[in-house]
């Protein structure tokens, strides 16, 4: 039986699966138990929860700083590029997504240094992290569905003259014969930009995992 409750500072893989694929638990325990064990290791459930407990109470940009520091993750931006980031007014930042969650957090932190009214469109599973809730506009990437309320939340931020970060590929870049590249970008961000009359700020994220 999967766990239904979650404290403010821990994640539970069972609950994450239950929210996305409840039919998984209709299968035989001989299938679900070893699968859950593997998924917990893949998600580093124990290590993540140790980090969350250690940093309980940290939210927003402070939480991001703790995450980046934990992974010894740094980024560099030229002064010219930094000056291209408007300090106010509605704006959509569109970027490639080569490194997974860390590049999204780093981009959030960068924009937040210039203007704190920034949010990122990201997988709704991140809402399980209390430290990120105030900065995330959740969408269902795994289910391939973006609901009307989710789109409305994105557009409301732009109408409120805030900045919104979007990864149009909707997923992390993949290896291809010509290198690591995003999948085809979804054009929905153009429709949002047109409807809200929002300028676009393209960002290219380069880097590597070490």
Regions found by a protein language model. Give the residues of each.
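"Short basic amphipathic alpha-helical interaction patches in structured regions
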Residues: 105-111, 152, 180
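A structural signal for short, well-ordered beta-strand segments and their strand-loop junctions
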Residues: 119-122, 165-167, 200-204
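Gly/Ser/Thr-rich loops at beta-strand to alpha-helix junctions
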Residues: 97-101, 172-173
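Short, flexible loop segments at the rims of nucleotide/cofactor-binding pockets, characterized by
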Residues: 53, 68-73, 97, 140-145, ...
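Membrane-anchoring hydrophobic helices of lipid-metabolizing enzymes
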Residues: 2-94, 104-106, 113-115, 133-134
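Catalytic-site beta-strand/loop segments enriched in glycine and acidic/polar residues
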Residues: 91, 157-190
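Conserved nucleotide-cofactor-binding alpha/beta core module
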Residues: 112, 119-159
């Amino acid at each position: 039986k999967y766990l239904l409750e979650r404290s403010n500072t821990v994640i539970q893989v069972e609950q994450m699966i239950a929210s996305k694929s409840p039919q998984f638990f209709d299968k035989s325990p001989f299938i679900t138990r070893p699968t859950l064990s593997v998924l917990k290791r893949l998600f580093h459930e124990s290590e993540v929860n140790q980090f969350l407990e250690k940093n309980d109470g940290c939210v927003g940009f402070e939480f991001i700083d703790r995450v980046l520091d934990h992974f010894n993750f740094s980024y560099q931006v030229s002064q010219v590029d930094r000056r291209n980031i408007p300090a106010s007014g509605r704006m959509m930042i569109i970027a490639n997504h080569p490194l997974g969650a860390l590049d999204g957090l780093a981009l959030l932190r960068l924009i937040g240094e210039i203007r704190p009214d920034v949010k990122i469109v990201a997988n709704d599973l991140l809402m399980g992290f209390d430290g990120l809730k105030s900065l995330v506009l959740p969408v269902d990437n795994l289910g391939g569905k973006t609901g009307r309320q989710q789109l409305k939340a994105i557009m409301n931020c732009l109408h409120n003259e805030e900045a919104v970060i979007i990864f149009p590929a909707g997923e992390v870049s993949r290896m291809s014969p010509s290198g690591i590249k995003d999948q085809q970008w979804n054009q929905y961000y153009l429709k949002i930009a047109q409807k809200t009359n929002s300028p676009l700020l393209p960002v290219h994220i380069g880097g590597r995992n070490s």
